[in-house]
């Protein structure tokens, strides 16, 4: 029993080291990737979209890029015709956050569910993305 505890501690330490490194390298790669589209930023946002921008920056930008322009090799731009409201309605954003998304338009891989966001927070984030889209001719 005395030898079992140090072995378990060693295994846990190795696991932590391996997984911590993976998470940090994924975040670092996401931060360094180039934008996939160039967009114009609206000079003003509605109140809901302003709240949504804060939520997007905190929860989405690491993968989808600042102002939803995507990141090469990481995640697609959300300011893109594929995500226009007639093809991906607002509820699709809710479902993506709640359940994740199987890759179907892009070759970035699957998107995991995002924990900790309420429907109201996702609604605000969606409002932000929609205002960016409209400002860039995506209706």
Predicted region positions:
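Hydrophobic membrane-insertion alpha-helices, especially the h-region
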Residues: 2-18
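Short glycine/proline- and charge-enriched loop/turn segments
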Residues: 3, 33-39, 76-79
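Hydrophobic single-pass membrane-insertion segments
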Residues: 16-28
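Electrostatic cytochrome c docking/interface patches
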Residues: 26-55
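Stable alpha-helical elements in mature extracytoplasmic
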Residues: 48, 89, 93, 121-122
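The canonical Cys-X-X-Cys-His
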Residues: 52, 56-66, 111, 125-129
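Gly/Gly-Pro-rich "capping" loops immediately C-terminal to redox-active cysteine motifs
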Residues: 53, 65-96, 113-116
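Axial heme c-ligation environment in periplasmic c-type cytochrome domains
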Residues: 72-79, 99-132, 137-139
């Amino acid at each position: 029993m005395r030898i079992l505890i140090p072995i378990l501690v060693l295994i846990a330490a190795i696991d932590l080291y391996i997984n911590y490194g993976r998470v940090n390298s994924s975040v670092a790669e996401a931060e360094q990737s180039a934008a996939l589209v160039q967009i114009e930023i609206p000079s003003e946002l509605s109140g809901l979209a302003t709240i949504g921008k804060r939520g997007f920056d905190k929860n989405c930008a690491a993968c989808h890029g600042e102002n939803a322009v995507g990141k090469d090799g990481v995640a697609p731009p959300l300011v893109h015709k594929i995500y226009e409201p007639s093809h991906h309605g607002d509820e699709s954003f809710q479902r993506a956050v709640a359940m994740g998304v199987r890759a179907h338009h892009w070759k970035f891989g699957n998107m995991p569910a995002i924990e900790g966001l309420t429907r109201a927070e996702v609604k605000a984030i969606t409002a932000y993305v929609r205002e960016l889209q409209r400002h860039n001719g995506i209706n």
